Amino acid sequence: MTQLNIAPTPADTAAANNNANAAAGAKQVARWRVADIVALYELPFNDLMFKAQQTHREHFDANTVQLSTLLSIKTGGCEEDCAYCPQSVHHDTGLQADKLMPVDEVLAAAKVAKENGATRFCMGAAWRNPKDRHLEPIKDMIRGVKAMGLETCVTLGMLETHQAQGLREAGLDYYNHNLDTSPEFYGQIISTRTYQDRLDTLERVRDAGINVCCGGIVGLGESRRERAGLIAQLANMEPYPESVPINNLVQVEGTPLTGTEAIDPFEFVRTIAIARITMPRAMVRLSAGREQMDEALQALCFLAGANSIFYGDQLLTTSNPQAEADRKLLERLGIRAEAAQQMPLDQSGCEHSCDKHAAPN
């Protein structure tokens, strides 16, 4: 999958910065190269933030965020060996594996999420890939959540073509399937699923007409260039994802990444800003790891272009700031919670090749 977008070509550090300056304001030119994104990382912090905020305001109300709730509908027992994940059977984290939640319990949780202000309800199941029989109750969940007027998203692992089509027919708005990291660093994080496996699932989702939710995790021990490689992969998709969750590693005792040096907070903010610049129309979602951030750091992330947060008491198997604290922070910042600002793939004037795939609005 390829994406025509902005792409300066730096020759040295000074030229790289000049090209990065031009890139942020340019329209469609060419693919993003890893070196171009490294050049953005190397900009002075204030310059990068200014460019990200300019880009953000061109496409969104800078003082609104979407509130999303994520529910783990099937926890633990996953066959994959992702080094960061406590749900893997390969890691001794003390996590108790559970079966798929009943439909009525999921819908009850969605009702509470809506009452608390969420407009997007995400359902995650710890599978390598679901069996067809698993999808029937999930389709009922999707229909029930949509009937409440909530945007729907699921993350279930790898999908076959007919499975993606079935989820689309049930009315699914978004399918989440993260790349996690760059192709170069990927082998140090997971061995049970290839990078191409992930790209293939994303292509099936796109071909089915479902909006793509795809991002990654930073703080895994990757280098800046490898972080840039992740952003390049995302930004060069055709089209780039409508939804881009940026996760900050939450270290869980018993996983191989326990003890990994944490990413510098400003580097995390830079990553948010660069996601906004390179994917200007995407919803950039401040995801896992937010509980590790103080309020000032979260505010910088909003300034950098994050316009969605996962909201509530639990984010899959890691804790998340409580809903009341979130409400107070947003109020102090003058940020309003609003409904989804979804990017339709067939919108006129779309910056990337929109005519290839249709998606629900």
UniProtKB/Swiss-Prot annotation:
Molecular function per GO: 2 iron, 2 sulfur cluster binding; 4 iron, 4 sulfur cluster binding; biotin synthase activity; iron ion binding
E.C. number(s) listed in UniProt: 2.8.1.6
Record-listed [4Fe-4S] cluster binding positions: C78, C82, C85
Residues of the Radical SAM core domain: 63-290
InterPro entries noted in UniProt: Aldolase_TIM, BATS_dom, Biotin_synth/BioAB, Biotin_synthase, Elp3/MiaA/NifB-like_rSAM, rSAM
Cofactor(s) listed: [4Fe-4S] cluster; [2Fe-2S] cluster
Keyword check for Phosphoprotein: no
Keyword ATP-binding listed: no
Pathway(s) annotated for this protein in UniProt: Cofactor biosynthesis; biotin biosynthesis; biotin from 7,8-diaminononanoate: step 2/2
Catalytic activity: (4R,5S)-dethiobiotin + (sulfur carrier)-SH + 2 reduced [2Fe-2S]-[ferredoxin] + 2 S-adenosyl-L-methionine = (sulfur carrier)-H + biotin + 2 5'-deoxyadenosine + 2 L-methionine + 2 oxidized [2Fe-2S]-[ferredoxin]
Residues annotated as binding [2Fe-2S] cluster: C122, C153, C213, R285
Enzyme class label: transferase
Keyword annotations: 2Fe-2S, 4Fe-4S, Biotin biosynthesis, Iron, Iron-sulfur, Metal-binding, S-adenosyl-L-methionine, Transferase
One GO-annotated biological process of the protein: biotin biosynthetic process
Family annotation (Gene3D superfamilies): Aldolase class I
Entry note: cofactor: Binds 1 [4Fe-4S] cluster. The cluster is coordinated with 3 cysteines and an exchangeable S-adenosyl-L-methionine.
Parts of the chain that traverse the membrane: none
Similarity remark: Belongs to the radical SAM superfamily. Biotin synthase family.
Function: Catalyzes the conversion of dethiobiotin (DTB) to biotin by the insertion of a sulfur atom into dethiobiotin via a radical-based mechanism.
HAMAP family reported in the protein's UniProt record: BioB (MF_01694)
SUBUNIT field: Homodimer.
Family annotation (PANTHER family): BIOTIN SYNTHASE, BIOTIN SYNTHASE, MITOCHONDRIAL
Name of the protein in question: Biotin synthase
Organism, scientific name: Paraburkholderia phytofirmans (strain DSM 17436 / LMG 22146 / PsJN)
